[in-house]
Amino acid sequence: MLKSCGRKLLLSLVGSMFTCLLVLMVEPPGRPGLARGEAGGAQRALQSLGAARAAGQGAPGLRSFADYFGRLSRARRELPAAPPSPPRPPAEDITPRDVFIAVKTTKKFHKARLELLLDTWISRNRDMTFIFTDGEDEELKKQARNVINTNCSAAHSRQALSCKMAVEYDKFIESGRKWFCHVDDDNYVNVRTLVKLLSSYPHTQDIYIGKPSLDRPIQATERISENKMHPVHFWFATGGAGFCISRGLALKMSPWASGGHFMSTAEKIRLPDDCTIGYIIESVLGVKLIRSNLFHSHLENLHQVPKTEIHKQVTLSYGMFENKRNSIHMKGAFSVEEDPSRFRSVHCLLYPDTPWCPSNVVY
């Protein structure tokens, strides 16, 4: 009798498992079913289990249940890999000539910083690069094609920085180009990656792209009148990492940015130039910043940028971070003493055909 009860219990258990499998094989409404190949593999495994049960097998039938999952897994593995989805087509075809790169500097850094940029990334992109400084330098004009003396103060003050940004904005509008990109004199710009990024967005739409340096919106006080203040908060892309603005958006900024308006707008919130850009775009115009981790400033730990990903970055930087030297961590033909910024090593990685780059170097 015990043997008969055990047989009934076993058959009941196998029958329940079979029913569960049938339920699993039925595609619920609103959910995608198995791929054709997977469904075929699952069906074959299920048929094997059904055949074993029909043949009156007991314990072997239980092994068939486990075998079903093995067969289903094999069916999944044997399916050809799905082809990678095609890359998103560019919104429009642009060339470096469509981009206006403004490099903000000061006369005391013409040799210490600008010479490095002129030897590296600017050397291949002179027509699209415009250097905004605060003093005359005939030697610099011989090396760079577009040098603009803003006649702004050389001080690193809110007013001086906003003065230069105002000139940058006006010169961009005059240029008729599609994209305005601002960087500092301690940035390396990978122009190929920059152009590829910008081509993903129509320049006629409202595009503001860069990286914030804060983990929350900045809070400021907007001066409405002599005695009335209004709190505002907004995101802004830090100028130290670089940022880009489409022409469509730049034109909308005109009432608050063109002519002398940019400086008066900056005074209204009493914040520096990059914050003022964010204020106009996010707080006044209601356009959101598009964050991109491809922009980098010296305010972040640059050692965390993988060497294998350097060619994908838009901007890099160097400086000090937590009282330590902060630059891209990579090997190259130049020692850290010879190339403390690592910009020369990065440039040779991206452009090994550069005449001064050593050949046969593993980066």
From Swiss-Prot:
GO CC, one annotated term: Golgi membrane
Transmembrane segments: 9-29
Keyword terms, alphabetized: Developmental protein, Disulfide bond, Glycoprotein, Glycosyltransferase, Golgi apparatus, Manganese, Membrane, Metal-binding, Signal-anchor, Transferase, Transmembrane, Transmembrane helix
Gene3D superfamilies: 3.90.550.50
The protein's enzyme class: transferase
Catalytic activity as recorded in UniProt: 3-O-(alpha-L-fucosyl)-L-threonyl-[EGF-like domain protein] + UDP-N-acetyl-alpha-D-glucosamine = 3-O-(N-acetyl-beta-D-glucosaminyl-(1->3)-alpha-L-fucosyl)-L-threonyl-[EGF-like domain protein] + UDP + H(+); 3-O-(alpha-L-fucosyl)-L-seryl-[EGF-like domain protein] + UDP-N-acetyl-alpha-D-glucosamine = 3-O-(N-acetyl-beta-D-glucosaminyl-(1->3)-alpha-L-fucosyl)-L-seryl-[EGF-like domain protein] + UDP + H(+)
Cofactor dependence: Mn(2+); Co(2+)
Domain of life: Eukaryota
Active-site feature positions: D274
Pfam families for this protein: Fringe
Residue numbers on the Cytoplasmic membrane side: 1-8
Annotated Mn(2+) binding sites: D186, H298
Molecular function GO terms recorded: metal ion binding; O-fucosylpeptide 3-beta-N-acetylglucosaminyltransferase activity
PANTHER family, per the entry: FRINGE-RELATED (PTHR10811)
Protein name: Beta-1,3-N-acetylglucosaminyltransferase lunatic fringe
Role noted for this protein: Glycosyltransferase that initiates the elongation of O-linked fucose residues attached to EGF-like repeats in the extracellular domain of Notch molecules. Essential mediator of somite segmentation and patterning.
Places the protein is found: Golgi apparatus membrane
Residues annotated as site: Cleavage: R77, E78
